[in-house]
Amino acid sequence: MQSLRFRQIDPGMTLREIDSEILKYWKDKNILEKILSKGGSKKFVFLEGPPTANGRPHIGHAMTRTIKDIVLRYNTMTDHKIYRRVGGWDCHGLPVELEAEKHFGFHTKSEIVNFGVEKFNQYCRESIFRYIDEWKQVDDLIGFSIDHNGDYITLRNDYMESEWFALKTMYNSGLLYKDYTVVPYCPRCETSLSSHEVAQGYKDVKDPSVYVRFKSADEENTYFVAWTTTPWTLPSNEFLVVNPDMEYSLVEAQGSRYYVASSRAGYIFKEYREIRRMHGRDLVGKRYLQLMPFLDPPSGSLKVVAGSFVTSEDGSGIVHAAPAFGADDYQIGKEEGVEILNPVDKNGRFADPRIPWNGKFVRDANEDIIVYLKKNQMLLKSEKYEHSYPFCYRCDTPLLYYPLDAWFIAVSRIRDKLVEYNERINWKPDYLKHGRFGNFLGEAKDWNLSRDRFWGTPLPAWRCKNGHLVFVGSRKEIEDLGGKVPEDLHRPYIDEVRFKCPTCGEEMSREPYVIDTWFDSGSATYAASHYPFEKNFDPETDVPVSFITEAIDQTRGWFYVLHVIATIMFNKNAYESALSINFILDAQGRKMSKSKGNSVYALDFLNEVPPDSLRLFFLYGAPWKSKNLDKKVIDEVSRKTLMTVLNVYSFFAYNANIDNFQWNGLQLSGNALDRYMVSKVNSFVRSSRDAYESLDFHEVVRASMEFVDDLSNFYLRLSRRRFWAEGFDDDKLSAYSTLYYALKAFSEVMAPITPFFSDFIYLNLGGDKESVHLEAFPEFDSTLMDEKLESEMDRAYSVIETVRRLRQENSIKGRQPLREILIAGDMEESIIDVVKSELNAKDIKLIERDQEPIRLSADLRMDRAAPVLRSRVNAVRHKIRSMDGLEVQRQISEKGFVEIDGVRLDPDMVEISRVPDPNYAYSQTEKYGIDVFINKNIDRDGYLEGLARELVRRIQVMRKEMNLNYTDRIITHLDLSDDFLEALNKHAEYIKNETQSDSIITDKVEGMKLWEINGEPVRIKIDLAR
């Protein structure tokens, strides 16, 4: 038996079967390895944002990895050599430690210390790769084409050594410093956080808001009204702060006198009398009495000071300041040179027996403190205040602002450079450049780098008892200083390293900090290559990296820290392009979370949905817009594109094998439909290449859906009879050649987005390479493009779609010939001739607008007219409805209004509608503004022809059910009602030719299939002709 040139696929083949077949093929043929080793004349530097593998990958990770893969595959096909096409794993930090704490049942840091840092860190090391196999399995299933054999891992000594080099560089340049200050602090994790970590954890909460009266030390029966949303800080009050330029009033209310911002007095007091006004600067220096007599106020406190941060938008215009618990407060305390009152321990509990709430978590004490204030007549007003408050982005505990020693990177000193280098980055979406990301850069704060924790990259700072400091930048430097380098650079082993101080000779020990894990991931640019200790990384050519992408929250996470570190280390931006991805929501549009029970894990979902269908869905709309994860939408998008292309390929392969078609390049006969489709292919290639280059991958998907619609519902529907024609002339060769050309182009253009399906089509078309992913991305050929022809054919297609819609609206089947179609608009007669078979009408006429079977009808727009005309509105409406709409339109056109019985109606008060002749149904094409009319009347001849076509369709369905080849001849038996019998007698030859029937016999035989057509019973049986 002769082998088939083109594989004929089972009609029931699914995308799941295709994906599985191609994945097996790739593994059998080592396709990934061949992609990885593919050369190129241009360099593309990739950087994978490292996830932590101690948790399962969710559906959002699948989307991120899909977009990374699209970029990699496209650039491989466009002659780029991909540098560092590897994965990465983030290994350190609170996320890992918290999972370890859960495992052991720990709740405090002291429990970890008692258990043993060595054992704790060993568990952290083992746990981080718990789900790495699942991550790699998801990467396989989704088609992520990276080399996991070369993954960078942030816990490796080489990686951390590169970070040490960077930290020493920063220290030597004066950009890394230590300070005692108030920092964002998590009492659960007992460590400080950086500003970019804090930015990821804000929630809207309702906190108690209190207006408290502080008694003046110098004026009788006089008080300062201070406002706070943290009552727990009141025992530590040291100052009251006013804005020096704001206006304040001394008012009399409730039998006492109060200083308050002038604009806020009416909010705080229902009734008051203003005594006098002054500016905030006039209040500076005034003294007041301690509010709560529990702690000893330091010398120099309990006075009014100035602060420009005070506003009158809410509160009282006077802010209570506790320097221990606020950044602005601390700065005031520092400027005033006073000691700070801190009765709170590192667990966030009051830890001073003089305070009545000793031992209580500070935020839990708020209500008790309000009761105390009220009881002691210190409270003027109490309410709930909704505001945005920071929570630990890892453990969800409310943060405190707390005084600590900490190491900082002086980001504020390079703020101008950060903003300048941001201008070099191509952002998708572009509004992030000067929006969410750019605004954050413009307010960049010094980076709180140190963490008082256990599992992380150790801070390489050694100090002696005399305060001398040595920053180490490599393992060799430790040896040179006389220390012994441990095999593992983590705690507790690195803590045991000692050496003599090069300045005074005393023993030096390491400061017991690890660094922010964001510094780990932000160092991937260079540390993944063990820079500068190995020579496989060149900052001149490898920075900036070409492209990065992660979820929207990383604009203040990984995107930010990459940019900061590259600016400091290499004096340039970290990346050329960045694409930010929005969240995948559940089917109801809710954000997914474990607590809601609506999380979707990638592996589970990929076991239900074919990967190409999911990948296509991810780009069904811009990736920076959120999407509801809806299987119905996924199936619909897949059906309209991939399944439609599969059916087109099936049609092509079946017929091409019958005619023994062989691809020998594009061979066109001049047929207008072929020229149109070939032009469409090249337009599709051009627009898709532009979209890939601009990172608008959703535009490729949109263009592909339009292309598939043009190919299947327009080109193939109008061309299919050419494939069925006897013989093999130039016109038939041109049709095969065009269809092959279109299918192959689709497989190559869509290869980065739907890699499995594209390779399936490409391989079955007999592509030259082992995989479409080893092909070059197609180039468009401008000599084959005809924009005028495309426009004319697109207009014709829009007419066809409009006629289909009018048929459906008027219950006229597509196989029923219409008596007449009238078309008014910009259309060519020659194009109508090309598409008239699809329009299925006895008569098709191009007419002028003034020949349309339509009249204009005028009416009032009641929403506009009624308020003006009032009681006369019904009379005027009756009159305008009786007028000729054309005359109303003429008056408006000539005079700018229409006048009825002395009433002047402006154009916005009048609605003019087009009302078709009752014999016609009318609509306008969605594009191009072409008017289309179909005659709704069906005469007897047209009705009988429609019945004949219905018979043909049923016989063809039965041929398909019997798996007959197109060339198989049949004998057809029919048992018909009178109308169908009349239709058969009139159109017998047509029915024979369409169904390959040698003869049609009207009789009753065994095994006939019953159909109901137009309410009439029709029985059919077909036999192979002998």
From Swiss-Prot:
Keywords: Aminoacyl-tRNA synthetase, ATP-binding, Cytoplasm, Ligase, Metal-binding, Nucleotide-binding, Protein biosynthesis, Zinc
Gene3D superfamilies in UniProt: HUPs (3.40.50.620), Isoleucyl-tRNA Synthetase, Domain 1 (1.10.730.10), Valyl/Leucyl/Isoleucyl-tRNA synthetase, editing domain (3.90.740.10)
Cofactor(s) required for function per UniProt: Zn(2+)
Domain of life: Archaea
SUPFAM superfamilies: Anticodon-binding domain of a subclass of class I aminoacyl-tRNA synthetases (SSF47323), Nucleotidylyl transferase (SSF52374), ValRS/IleRS/LeuRS editing domain (SSF50677)
Gene Ontology cellular-component terms listed: cytoplasm
Keyword Transferase: no
Reactions that this protein is recorded to catalyse: tRNA(Ile) + L-isoleucine + ATP = L-isoleucyl-tRNA(Ile) + AMP + diphosphate
Compartment(s) where it occurs, according to its Swiss-Prot or TrEMBL record: Cytoplasm
Placement of sequence motif 'HIGH' region: 51-61
GO BP of this protein: isoleucyl-tRNA aminoacylation
CDD domains per the UniProt record, alphabetical: Anticodon_Ia_Ile_ABEc, IleRS_core
Motif ('KMSKS' region): 591-595
GO molecular function, one term: aminoacyl-tRNA deacylase activity
Residues noted as binding ATP in the record, renumbered to the chain: 594
UniProt-listed Enzyme Commission number(s): 6.1.1.5
NCBIfam families recorded: ileS
Subunit structure: Monomer.
Annotated function: Catalyzes the attachment of isoleucine to tRNA(Ile). As IleRS can inadvertently accommodate and process structurally similar amino acids such as valine, to avoid such errors it has two additional distinct tRNA(Ile)-dependent editing activities. One activity is designated as 'pretransfer' editing and involves the hydrolysis of activated Val-AMP. The other activity is designated 'posttransfer' editing and involves deacylation of mischarged Val-tRNA(Ile).
Domain notes: IleRS has two distinct active sites: one for aminoacylation and one for editing. The misactivated valine is translocated from the active site to the editing site, which sterically excludes the correctly activated isoleucine. The single editing site contains two valyl binding pockets, one specific for each substrate (Val-AMP or Val-tRNA(Ile)).
Family classification: Belongs to the class-I aminoacyl-tRNA synthetase family. IleS type 2 subfamily.
Protein name per the record: Isoleucine--tRNA ligase
Biological source species: Thermoplasma acidophilum (strain ATCC 25905 / DSM 1728 / JCM 9062 / NBRC 15155 / AMRC-C165)
Organism lineage: Archaea, Methanobacteriati, Thermoplasmatota, Thermoplasmata, Thermoplasmatales
